[in-house]
């Protein structure tokens, strides 16, 4: 098991070595905007560290905690979640408002579902600045 902070405190990911599977809890998102509104700069780093721990297990399949039910369980969603968080952090520094951050992220990730999660995340990030 991997315990860490992601979109909430005390997220747990379960590793089943016999079938090379990770059930990622809230650590990995699959084609959904991650809910970053419950975290901050330190939390982003903890989330990225959790993704590193999950990736180090070298699973063949990862069941994401959030995403459309018809999506695959490809481990590439670990890296996609990591890149999303890093992009969000970078654009948070490069933009001047929640709306600008939201719009820039939507341009980069137009096919992800739940834009309300992105909007809440952008508002929280800019309120902390």
What are these regions (language model features)?
Residues 56-61, 69-129:
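Accessory terminal helices/loops
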Residues 3-79, 87, 91:
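Metallo-beta-lactamase
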Residues 1-4, 98:
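A charged, solvent-exposed segment within the mature domains of Sec-exported extracytoplasmic proteins
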